[in-house]
Amino acid sequence: MKNQKLLIFNVHFMPNSFGGATIVAENMARYLQRDHNWDIVVVTTIKDPKIVPYGIVRYQSAGISIIAINAPQSLSYVEFYKHDKMSTIIRNLIQNIEPDVAHVHSIQTMGAGILDELSCAGVPVAVTVHDCWWICERQFMINKDNRYCFQAKIDRNVCQHCVDDFVRADLRLDYLRDALLKADMLLFPSEFHKQLFVQNDFPVHKCHVNKNGILPPRVGYKKTEVKDSSHKVRFGFTGGPGPIKGLDIIVKAFSGIDSADYELVLVDAAQNIQVSWHMGLNVDVKGTLTVRPAYTQETMDGFFSQIDVLLFPSQWKESFGLTVREALIRDVWVISTDVGGPAEDCVDTENSALIPLTSDAAFLTSAIEACMDKDWKSYKNPYKKALQTVASQAEELSDYLTRLANKVEH
């Protein structure tokens, strides 16, 4: 039986990997092709000043055929979501590739015209809605004050106070809504994120949860022992600078703790895109502060084996929280805000401590203090078998895509 052909779209792709959505897109492409007999072609973008704008580069990575369109160095406001020149190129690619089904991930700069082209070509489409780009100009529902806006049912009268030009933002929202409604299936990384879009009148029969999968630890993975007894508990944070991921609250929380018997490990994740944020870092804690280089999917075992507790005091309702699951499956305790996707696999007091979404650091301080006297050497997460792995996500996704390709009711 001939393999079915799957066309995948994502703004970034290996070797130019960036962001959680890209990790998911790459993992799914690899596993769908390797384990589920899909013939896969990926369409992505690059930004290479040595190549003419809109030039096409074809290459292979991890055995996957990739077509990269060279995006211009600068784009207009409209081109970030409605990119007509990209759409023309993609129309020709669709005609040449003749896919059985398409899977759309994050397509900022590529433009939602992709969905028009696929619809016109009669190609069934699944869209994984990784974030709020489709319903929020600022993509993550974080307002001008750098705080979560807390809307559930989007009221554009509220949005007008958050954008620079409401008329153009309104046109953008109309266009993206109409485009997303052309998809045959909408996939979401969490029940929370699915319900957000259902509340905003996207058809419930099209909406399904396909939780992001994580790579389990390698065989033989185990925690490293603390060599210096003065660093009794090791706390890790991967979110970077700024208030929205919670670093400010972490600093405040530790300032209220008298003990210096801990290590705070910060990951300079920006190094994965050849920049760094730690040079201007101003973190003053009584314990030992360590800044470590960014880790990759291949090296994350090393990072998680050297921390006991992951700090995830995010100040917005994230759609999933990949880092939380990567920690949970490696027997790392998690302190997380009790909102959105990150909390869905956390069981308070059993594999995590859930705290309110608030700028008051007292809740985080209490959760940190509760970790100080625990013996983390023997801790095991009793719920880690329930976590979605990359393999199980790919199996579930393959079933969804097969149903679409074969035009089976879903």
Each model region followed by its residue ranges:
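Conserved donor-binding/catalytic core segment of Leloir-type glycosyltransferases
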Residues: 7, 227-245, 251-254
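Short alpha-helical segment that forms part of, or immediately flanks, the ligand-binding pocket
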Residues: 301, 324-329, 343-344
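A short, active-site helix/loop in glycosyltransferases that binds the activated sugar's phosphate group
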Residues: 163-206
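Short hydrophobic beta-strand element within catalytic cores of glycosyltransferases
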Residues: 309, 333-336
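Glycosyltransferase donor-sugar binding loop
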Residues: 238, 263-278
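N-terminal subdomain of nucleotide-sugar transferases
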Residues: 1-55, 60-65, 121, 255
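Nucleotide-activated donor-binding/catalytic signature segment of Leloir-type glycosyltransferases, i.e.
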Residues: 276-298, 302
